[in-house]
């Protein structure tokens, strides 16, 4: 798994936990829905920390809470 997939999985997980639709979290956080969908489909080469922070604000969690999962802990180095 790479970082883009881990970010997408985390967004989906948080939406399911909170019963929030993708469009709803986009609207709540002020991130354009197409940007969120690009992040979820791993089309975005760099999801961007600013957009992730906005989504965290919408979920009412910190960046630390967003990244504090076993998926992120298990990521391998992506520099080649």
Where are these predicted regions, by residue range?
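Short alpha-helical DNA-recognition segment
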Residues: 20-38
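Residue-level detection of the helix-turn-helix DNA-binding "recognition helix"
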Residues: 16, 30, 41, 71
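Short, charged recognition helix plus adjacent turn
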Residues: 38, 67-80
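The alpha-helix within a helix-turn-helix
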Residues: 15, 26, 56
């Amino acid at each position: 798994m790479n970082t883009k997939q881990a970010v997408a999985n985390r967004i989906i997980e948080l939406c399911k936990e909170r019963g929030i639709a993708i469009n709803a979290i986009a609207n709540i956080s002020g991130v354009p829905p197409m940007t969120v969908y690009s992040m979820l489909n791993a089309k975005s080469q760099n999801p961007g920390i600013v957009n992730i922070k906005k989504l965290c604000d919408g979920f009412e969690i910190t960046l630390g809470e967003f990244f504090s999962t076993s998926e992120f802990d298990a990521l391998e180095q992506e520099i080649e």
